[in-house]
Amino acid sequence: LNSITRLHRFSALVRSHIRDPRRLDAVTEIVGLDLFCPNDLYFFKPPGTGRPIAWHQDSWYFRNIYVSSVGDAIDQSTIGTWLALDDADEANGCLWVIPGSHRLGVIDHSQVESDDYLLQKRVTVSDEMEERAMPVEVPKGALVFFNNALLHRSTPNRSDRFRRAYIVHYMKATIQHTGNRPRFPEGTEHWGTPEMYICGQQLPGCVQTTLEKDSMDWDRALERTLTEDDIRISEP
């Protein structure tokens, strides 16, 4: 088991963590006062295993699903947070980044020609960029903030320790759905990814985080919106 996505849909504890004022103090300063959460993700990466993740940008994935209603680039409308649940270092497969790569904007991704990687899309980087890459070694409890256009990856866990992490993405409320990749059955009101309201305004014509009401009621949420793609479990 490598990861579980969208825990916020079914856990009040997770939702309270995502809305923790200590997080939002920083996020609202960087992104803005009106926010929703498009996705959260829990990585296990157990000792001696855990598939690597190739160089990629989260904004590339978001660009296929969302568009700004006010003309902002998608990489200027989102931010990622990465919470270390264990000490993270090179040995147990910490996060790697290429400093300054977010200034390149969103780069096209290509298919990974290997089943060894957790994600099947990647950015091919130059030797010069590879040389600038640096590990993000942080202690348990550290919270890393990064632009969603920042090129990042992680390596396998070659240690005898876990390297667990919890990732939350925040997005401006000025975002609209592109109409791509519907994730809910026909006949329901919910399209796009299962977003969560965070703070501020919900703007007309933009993403409306109606799932907040459903997610408080486990049975209703399961009956109306749960599909196999909602909680995706990746086998090692």
Q: Where are these predicted regions, by residue range?
A:
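Non-heme Fe(II)-dependent double-stranded beta-helix
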Residues: 1-55, 60-66, 110, 181, ...
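Secondary-structure boundary elements
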Residues: 24, 28-36, 73-75, 85-91
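Generic beta-strand structural signal
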Residues: 33-35, 39-40, 51-53, 77-83, ...
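Short, structured patches in soluble enzyme cores that scaffold and shape functional sites
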Residues: 41, 46, 57-59, 79, ...
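Short edge-strand/loop segments of extracellular domains
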Residues: 45, 98-105, 163, 169-175
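Short, surface-exposed loop/helix-turn segments at secondary-structure junctions
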Residues: 57-59, 64-67, 114-132, 162, ...
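Double-stranded beta-helix
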Residues: 75-78, 88-153
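Non-heme Fe(II)/2-oxoglutarate
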Residues: 143-145, 149-236
